[in-house]
């Protein structure tokens, strides 16, 4: 496993003392919404402007800003002739991201973004240079989409917190399954390639529910509490290449790690205002070297930890510019170690690259 340099000097940590100006009134909404070019970066995602990396020189760079996505035009996707004709007669469709939460991507560069404000999943298809959106099933539209994940066949699964369901879609955007058994408030979800099961975090049940791909509930783990292996309003989930499960345990202010069968391994984190403390943990992701990426919603940064909970690096800051966040939520790290961060109140997804050995 490649070792990241520990970030010894973290400038601008005065932001750790700031408070969010917008405080959501709904408790559940607060939990989920916060109420040098390197090899492997596609040409279409290469950054414009000065190179932005973390940590700053003279340290070797480990994270590089790549791009920002707010609309199809940001990725060079232009409207086709028939789309223009359709909009001429029927009006323009909403294609600009408004309030992203969950994000995922496949190895070919298709990006899927759950937009809870527009109640859609945006699909940016880079290989085909196309954009479309999924609004739900033929029988019922999304009410509050949050989590997105893909299985090994690249079928899409979307959690809808209001519908108390997870809906499966084929690659053409057609619904093929609706999972409801046991669900009360599904949020984050992830597919485990080691056992071909779908893991769903339920905020209200304080549990992780595990299903086969036919929608059968196989087992659950967690349950409300502060003891190890217990959860308190969990929100997000990630699964590494070995099948280990990582949970953002929001109101216990920690990350918990489990085996694929729900057996507890370890946890780390605490509430506080020191560097690396977890005041409002949100999205979580894992890179190919096993580093844990955790969105810190209160301070508008992404913290990177090793599996023992040692803080290795922090990137981002509060703001609206490149590499800055305003109430970031979800995060996803793909097989090429591209990092996608749902920058919720900036209405965009920012893309970064993990640089192995500083390049």
List the model feature ranges, each with a label.
Residues 1-18:
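N-terminal secretory signal peptides that target proteins for export/translocation
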Residues 35-359:
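Eukaryotic scaffold repeat domains enriched in small/polar residues
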Residues 23-32:
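Bacterial N-terminal signal peptides
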Residues 1-2, 24, 193:
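Intrinsically disordered/low-complexity terminal segments and short unstructured peptides
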């Amino acid at each position: 496993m490649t070792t990241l340099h520990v970030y010894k000097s973290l400038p601008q940590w005065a932001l750790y003392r700031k408070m969010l100006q917008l405080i959501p009134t709904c408790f559940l909404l607060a939990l989920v919404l916060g109420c040098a070019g390197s090899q492997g970066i596609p040409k279409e995602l290469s950054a414009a402007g000065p190179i932005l990396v973390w940590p700053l020189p003279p340290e070797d760079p480990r994270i590089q800003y790549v791009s920002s996505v707010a609309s199809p035009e940001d990725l060079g996707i232009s409207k086709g002739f028939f789309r223009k004709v359709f909009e001429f007669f029927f009006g323009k469709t909403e294609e600009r991201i408004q309030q992203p939460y969950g994000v995922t991507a496949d190895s070919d560069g298709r990006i899927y973004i759950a937009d809870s404000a527009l109640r859609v999943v945006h699909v940016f298809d880079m290989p085909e240079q196309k954009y479309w959106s999924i609004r739900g099933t033929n029988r019922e539209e999304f009410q509050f989409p949050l989590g997105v994940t893909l299985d090994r066949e690249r079928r899409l699964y979307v959690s809808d917190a209001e519908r108390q369901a997870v809906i499966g879609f084929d690659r053409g955007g057609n619904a093929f399954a609706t999972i409801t058994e046991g669900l009360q408030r599904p949020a984050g979800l992830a597919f485990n390639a080691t056992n071909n099961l779908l893991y769903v975090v339920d905020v209200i049940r304080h549990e992780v529910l595990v299903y086969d791909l036919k929608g059968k509930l196989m087992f659950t783990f967690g349950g409300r509490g502060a003891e190890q292996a217990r959860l308190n309003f969990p929100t997000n989930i990630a699964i590494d290449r070995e099948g280990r499960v990582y949970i953002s345990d929001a109101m216990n202010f920690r990350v918990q790690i489990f085996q694929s069968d729900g057996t507890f391994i370890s946890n780390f984190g605490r509430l506080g205002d020191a560097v690396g403390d977890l005041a409002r943990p949100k999205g979580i992701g894992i890179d190919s070297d096993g580093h844990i990426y955790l969105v810190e919603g209160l301070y508008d940064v992404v913290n990177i930890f090793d599996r023992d909970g040692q803080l290795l690096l922090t990137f981002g800051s509060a703001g609206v510019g490149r590499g800055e966040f305003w109430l970031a939520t979800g995060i996803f790290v793909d097989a090429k170690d591209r990092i996608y961060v749902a920058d919720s109140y900036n209405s965009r997804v920012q893309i970064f690259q993990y640089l192995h050995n500083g390049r």
